[in-house]
Amino acid sequence: MVVFGLDFGTTFSSVCAYVGEELYLFKQRDSAYIPTYVFLHSDTQEVAFGYDAEVLSNDLSVRGGFYRDLKRWIGCDEENYRDYLEKLKPHYKTELLKVAQSSKSTVKLDCYSGTVPQNATLPGLIATFVKALISTASEAFKCQCTGVICSVPANYNCLQRSFTESCVNLSGYPCVYMVNEPSAAALSACSRIKGATSPVLVYDFGGGTFDVSVISALNNTFVVRASGGDMNLGGRDIDKAFVEHLYNKAQLPVNYKIDISFLKESLSKKVSFLNFPVVSEQGVRVDVLVNVSELAEVAAPFVERTIKIVKEVYEKYCSSMRLEPNVKAKLLMVGGSSYLPGLLSRLSSIPFVDECLVLPDARAAVAGGCALYSACLRNDSPMLLVDCAAHNLSISSKYCESIVCVPAGSPIPFTGVRTVNMTGSNASAVYSAALFEGDFVKCRLNKRIFFGDVVLGNVGVTGSATRTVPLTLEINVSSVGTISFSLVGPTGVKKLIGGNAAYDFSSYQLGERVVADLHKHNSDKVKLIHALTYQPFQRKKLTDGDKALFLKRLTADYRREARKFSSYDDAVLNSSELLLGRIIPKILRGSRVEKLDV
């Protein structure tokens, strides 16, 4: 029984297990970086995820719907729905709704593409993806998953953290902890930074988000001092800009559906130039010669945005620690976009960066760190990670300015209190409480996360005589970054503010779907065609009817399908299984587990 580490990403996700003092990554199609895609079959109770979902999305003979960009909708509610529509500009229909006992809304999404019109709730889609990924990984690791340590962007607010935690729990695998993505990456790089005498900046440039954290290390203890980031800045944005560049070069109307991930990765790691076929939606094709300097030029504005955030976070860290702003720091590069051409040299040129640390596998660092964190939960663990609150938590003054109760950078779990005095009050008086998350001085610019009216009689105040009543506001930040807000009366009676939880999916019926493994399906088809065409010393031909039937998509139960063929024979099929054994599945599937060196 093992706690798995999950890096739930915007573009790609990874899952890792820490077993026997070793880290292992799960692989699909010989890759540990699995697209955060879901395909829901409409005519069966099957679900495909990752690369399998991508394959099915392009097969017009398969009935169902394809979903992607799930993480980009986390945090969308009734207060910012229009902002999300403006930023994401989805071509599919969306709508707001409240799920189960949640007090705040989330979104229901129509499928991104597919052969059958479909829609599904965001919590249901995320939970389905997590369940399919973890259950398949558990089978590959040959161990039972008892819980999940999930990574989240450092810049997530408490509502986004609560939403993510609830989605993971809905999958059936309890979310035992959440770790900021840069913090998890730092933990996976512990052997490289534990001896560092200077602070370490963890630069996490992923597919959909950018995060940076400042970490100090002493032996095997890592403390997060400051964090920041941009929820709408990542490799996807560079992809979009690069697609526009390619189509302008080819003088064709832009087709945003084209996938350029292979081109970008090739230019980032392998080649300096190559020919790329640019195809319009009408099928017009133009071959374009692309070189690495073009990608670097397109990426440059996005890289500069990340560097601006790095400087702001480091300035905040130096100010809080009362250090000179030119104190030198090391910079650890993680995330898929950290391989961009020219990025290493540009980061090395930042005045306060004296060394850039490069990991053997920057993309797997977050999942590996989450799995390693399971060791931190043991009483005998030699490692300790102290994470921090990403934003100030504050109440409002009478001038609507922020009174900070939990400062950004505070270690979590954390409890902050603030005493207020209500003059001219008695048991029937009402206190209006509100808690804000954000770093602006003016409260209205921050995110209001809790609010409610409390009758003082409900917190132990008695009598009708007016007087000054001392009250205490208590803010608790849990180890997963979720928050509770309470009002405590003068005798210690406590009242939770905010009513129902923002996101509670405990009564949501996820439904039972079976993971459709295309590799098993394909290997079964190989066994079947071998059996249908086998005869001693030569191959026999299929009849036209059997050939037409075979070319149709078969269900997962290939033994049942086999009986539809006129040339089928039970004994021959059993022989084929013995002859092909485990070789064919391994060839078609590729390796499923990879050891991760840290």
From Swiss-Prot:
The UniProt record lists the keyword Transit peptide: no
PROSITE patterns, A to Z: HSP70_2 (PS00329), HSP70_3 (PS01036)
Locations listed in the record: Virion; Host cell junction, Host plasmodesma
Biological processes annotated in GO: transport of virus in host, cell to cell
GO molecular function: ATP binding; ATP-dependent protein folding chaperone
Family: Belongs to the heat shock protein 70 family.
Name used for this protein in its record: Movement protein Hsp70h
